């Protein structure tokens, strides 16, 4: 569960990018955040793992009964532990192109390895099996030993998703992951998100400009306008009037 209480974010130049954000996202939800560029979507997502600090308010994250975090008070080792549970994706694939697909997926475990094993690039049999399972989950197993730079953009983004789920996260935050893809590939990637959300019960929060994809795949849509939530609910209730409120000038 992720809960925002009266969250505000003001940049040093005085720009108010998040205004009185109050919302609760339950475990296992697939949530789309929509709105114009500059509405505060990316800033909102980046407060969840404290890439962006908030100016006021509170954010609470419950990973399980034994791991509960108040973001304002989370730092050091506690923050590192929280971030292990949060997978990050963006429109950039962030693959190492000269490495194989399997090695790219294995790289998600490096942060949890000791220094010498990480430097040597040594992965255990279990780690390799888990990485292959992540690729199989997304029907990418046949590409395991192919260099990443031989794949299409859509395939590379799906490898990035496999790498993210190999991290074994409870939450995935995706910032415009399909913006650089054509409609067919964008749908394929969204299908993958939906699959891992439903089959692995991973909470997925996605910042997306494609409203049609949000309506098609997501359980809930949050609409931001000038840093404020102006819509939060079932995609079926997102009518023309609400879209005009979110995107109108």
From Swiss-Prot:
**Primary localization class, coarse:** membrane
Q: Which SUPFAM superfamilies match?
A: P-loop containing nucleoside triphosphate hydrolases
Q: Which GO terms describe its molecular function?
A: ABC-type phosphonate transporter activity; ATP binding; ATP hydrolysis activity
Protein topology in the membrane: Peripheral membrane protein
Transmembrane residues, as ranges? none
- Residues recorded as binding ATP, renumbered to this chain, are 35-42
This protein's GO CC annotations: plasma membrane
Specify the ABC transporter domain's residue ranges. Answer: 2-246
Q: Which reaction does it catalyse?
A: phosphonate(out) + ATP + H2O = phosphonate(in) + ADP + phosphate + H(+)
| EC number(s) from the headed UniProt entry | 7.3.2.2
What is the superkingdom listed in this entry's lineage? Bacteria
Q: Where is the protein situated, by its record's location annotation? A: Cell membrane
Please name one Pfam family that this protein belongs to. Answer: ABC_tran
InterPro entries tied to this protein: AAA+_ATPase, ABC_transporter-like_ATP-bd, ABC_transporter-like_CS, ABC_transpr_PhnC, MetN_ABC_transporter-like, P-loop_NTPase
UniProt keyword terms in alphabetical order:
ATP-binding, Cell membrane, Membrane, Nucleotide-binding, Phosphonate transport, Translocase, Transport
Record-linked Gene3D superfamilies:
P-loop containing nucleotide triphosphate hydrolases
Describe the subunit structure.
The complex is composed of two ATP-binding proteins (PhnC), two transmembrane proteins (PhnE) and a solute-binding protein (PhnD).
Q: Which family does it belong to?
A: Belongs to the ABC transporter superfamily. Phosphonates importer (TC 3.A.1.9.1) family.
What does this gene product do? Part of the ABC transporter complex PhnCDE involved in phosphonates import. Responsible for energy coupling to the transport system.
Q: What is this protein called?
A: Phosphonates import ATP-binding protein PhnC
Q: What organism is the protein native to?
A: Mesoplasma florum (strain ATCC 33453 / NBRC 100688 / NCTC 11704 / L1)
């Amino acid at each position: 569960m992720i809960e925002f209480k009266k969250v505000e974010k003001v940049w040093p130049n005085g720009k108010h990018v998040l205004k009185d954000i109050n919302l609760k996202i339950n475990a296992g939800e697939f949530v789309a955040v929509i709105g114009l560029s500059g509405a505060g979507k990316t800033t909102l997502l980046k407060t969840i793992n404290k890439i962006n600090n908030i100016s006021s308010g509170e954010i609470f994250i419950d990973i399980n009964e034994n791991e509960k975090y108040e973001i304002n008070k989370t730092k050091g080792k506690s923050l590192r532990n929280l971030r292990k549970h949060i997978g990050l994706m963006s429109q950039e694939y962030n693959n190492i192109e000269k490495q194989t697909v399997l090695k790219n997926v294995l790289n998600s475990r490096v942060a949890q390895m000791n220094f010498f094993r990480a430097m040597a690039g040594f992965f255990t049999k279990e780690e390799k099996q888990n990485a292959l399972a992540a690729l199989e989950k997304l029907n990418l197993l046949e590409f395991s030993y192919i260099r990443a730079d031989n794949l299409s953009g859509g395939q590379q983004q799906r490898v990035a998703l496999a790498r993210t789920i190999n991290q074994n996260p409870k939450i995935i935050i995706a910032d415009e992951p399909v913006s650089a893809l054509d409609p067919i590939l964008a749908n394929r990637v969204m299908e993958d998100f939906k699959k891992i959300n439903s089959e692995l019960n991973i909470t997925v929060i996605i910042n997306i400009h494609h409203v049609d994809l949000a309506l098609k795949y997501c359980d809930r849509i949050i609409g931001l306008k000038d840093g404020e939530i102006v819509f939060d609910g079932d995609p079926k209730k997102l009518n023309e009037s609400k879209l005009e409120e979110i995107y109108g000038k």
